[in-house]
Design a protein with these regions (language model features):
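Aromatic-rich, lipid-facing transmembrane alpha helices and their immediate juxtamembrane interface loops
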Residues: 1-165
Length: 165
């Protein structure tokens, strides 16, 4: 949990306070957000453990994002989705836990849809510094979660290596 919090907190602050890709309802990150990332990560980890392992199966889970991403990019609603899709497939292809990243793509989208529907946060329609557009939330917001999960997995692996010496 501490490793998740160590990455989730600064990443949230960077994305919301520096990059400004989304904004919280009262302009400040609620204290429950980093812990919420741990709960979502743990749920994703548990679901991924119950699914058949393998990069090929994980790729199939992410596959439905392709037509939606292309449609949204073509219409101009979410041009950032093309890049996020490539990032997501990169994590599924080369990351240490491909099924986790595939599962997190869907869990993150569900959670982000719920949070935006509640009005807890809103994503910027124009992604700062990039010239890209984003849906509210971006269809592949799960790529940001997968980035955090990759960092957590690699860090945890290193910590365990050091402890086992």
């Amino acid at each position: 949990m501490l490793v998740v919090l160590a990455f989730a907190t600064p990443m949230e602050l960077f994305f919301s306070e520096v990059w400004l890709i989304y904004e919280y309802q009262r302009q400040l990150m609620p204290l429950y957000v980093p812990v919420g990332h741990w709960f979502l990560f743990d749920l994703g980890r548990r679901i991924a453990a119950k699914l058949p392992p393998g990069r090929k199966i994980a790729s199939w889970i992410v596959l439905p994002f392709i037509p939606l991403t292309v449609l949204m990019a073509y219409s101009g609603v979410d041009t950032s989705g093309i890049f996020l899709l490539m990032i997501m497939f990169g994590f599924v292809r080369w990351g240490p836990a491909p099924m986790l990243y595939a599962v997190m793509g869907w869990l993150a989208l569900g959670m982000e849809l719920w949070g935006t529907w509640l009005g807890t946060w809103v994503w910027a329609s124009n992604v700062p510094w990039t010239g890209l557009t984003a849906w509210n939330p971006p269809l592949l917001c799960g790529a940001f979660y997968a980035l955090g999960d990759v960092l957590v997995n690699l860090s945890t692996e290193k910590i365990e290596d050091v402890q086992n010496r």
